[in-house]
Structure formats: C-alpha cells, structure tokens
C-alpha cells in the first residue's frame, strides 16, 4: 500500500510505434481472425499470399476408405498400425510418423519397428537421441522412418526425397487442460454477451478455439512434407 501511494512521474508518449508485420506460412485458419483475436489486435491490414508450392502435382492426400474406429476405442490402435505398415511399405521408408500422443507412438514403435528394420529401414524414435541428431540421421539416410510426437510437427525441415511420406495418426485436437478450459469458458462468456444463444452458444468455443488450434497444428504437421519447390 505504501508503494502504491507514492507519487508517480508522468510519462508522455510522443513517438508513434513503428509498424509490426507478422509473417508465417500457417497463420490463416482459414483467415486471420483467430490470430488477431488471440493477440488482442482489433484492426490490421492482412494479406494471404498464394503458395509457391505445386501441391496438386507434387503431393497427394490419402484418407483411409471407410470409417475408422473411434480413437478412444481399443480397436483404433491396431487399425492405425495396419494402415501405417501399408503406407510405409508402399513408400519404402522416407516417412515421418507423427502421433498425437506418446501412447500411440509407443504402440506403433513396438509393433512396427522390427518389421521395418527387417526391410532395411532405419527406425528413429523420439526420445532415444537428441532431436537435432535424429533430424540429421534421417536426412543422411534417405529411407528412414521416424516415430515422433508434437516436437517434430514443426521446426524440422527435410528437403528433397529423404522425406516422401507424412502420416498423422488422427486429427490433433488439444487435450483438456486448465489453460485451454479457461479459454473456452472465456469464449462462452464473450459469445453470451454478444447475444449468441442455443446450440450456437454451445458450439461457439469448439468452433472458435478447438477447430482453429487443431487446424493450425494439422497444417504444421502436414507441412513437413513439401518444404521447397523441388519437393
């Protein structure tokens, strides 16, 4: 209290802050609204540039036919492992296997590592050596298989043919936690104050937090595949 009652020196701000530019390959989800909201930016000039990468001719999206088991069912793990084995066999290695949980990563590693090594593929597992060493060995080998979780979804770049396949086990929705739950409660209150009602209010946090965050993570993970115009 004594400190709060001390006289303050008035500070006059006479200089206009310089412009700030935010640049990223993954900010738009699909527009800039979520990023601006999270940063507290009320107004800004935005631009979404066309990608220089030829995804249509240089990449292919594979989604397994038919309905998969729910990720919370025991059958999902074996279904996932079977799909991974088929795809890695087809690509002959050069694969990032990106998992949304350590449990799925460990299950896949235990089931597939021996088979892949018998095929002559180098298997690298997150946690068995430093991240930089794993990335270097993957690039140098050319036909390796990486088993990894969130830390390899971003910040790792493998160019050319050393990486030919990226597999993501399931949609990377954020798990409940104190901070994430608090953000959802805040969004619910915000929506209610804006007059949102009924099911629109019920789904507002999911549509405006869960989905944008998941979309950003998915773009980060899938973005490991095409890194240059040569890929």
Residue ranges of predicted features:
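ASCE RecA-like P-loop NTPase motor cores
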Residues: 1-231
């Amino acid at each position: 209290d004594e400190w709060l009652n001390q006289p303050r020196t008035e500070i006059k701000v006479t200089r206009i802050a310089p412009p700030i530019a935010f640049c990223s390959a993954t900010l738009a989800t699909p527009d800039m609204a979520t990023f601006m909201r999270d940063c507290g930016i009320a107004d800004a000039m935005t631009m979404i540039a066309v990608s220089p990468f030829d995804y249509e001719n240089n990449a292919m999206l594979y989604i397994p036919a038919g309905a998969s088991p729910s990720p919370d069912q025991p059958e999902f793990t074996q279904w996932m492992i079977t799909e991974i084995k088929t795809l890695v066999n087809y690509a002959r290695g050069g694969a990032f296997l990106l998992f949304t949980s350590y449990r799925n990563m460990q299950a896949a590693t235990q089931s597939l590592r021996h088979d892949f090594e018998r095929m002559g593929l180098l298997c690298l597992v997150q946690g068995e050596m430093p991240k930089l060493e794993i990335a270097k060995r993957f690039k140098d080998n050319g036909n390796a298989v990486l088993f990894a979780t969130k830390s390899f979804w971003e910040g790792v770049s493998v160019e050319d043919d050393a990486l030919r396949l990226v597999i993501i086990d399931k949609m990377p929705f954020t798990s409940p936690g104190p901070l994430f739950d608090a953000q959802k409660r805040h969004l619910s209150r915000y929506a209610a104050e804006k007059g949102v009602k009924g099911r629109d209010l019920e789904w507002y946090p999911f549509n405006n937090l869960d989905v944008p965050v998941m979309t950003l993570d998915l773009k980060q993970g899938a973005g490991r595949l095409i890194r240059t115009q040569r890929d």
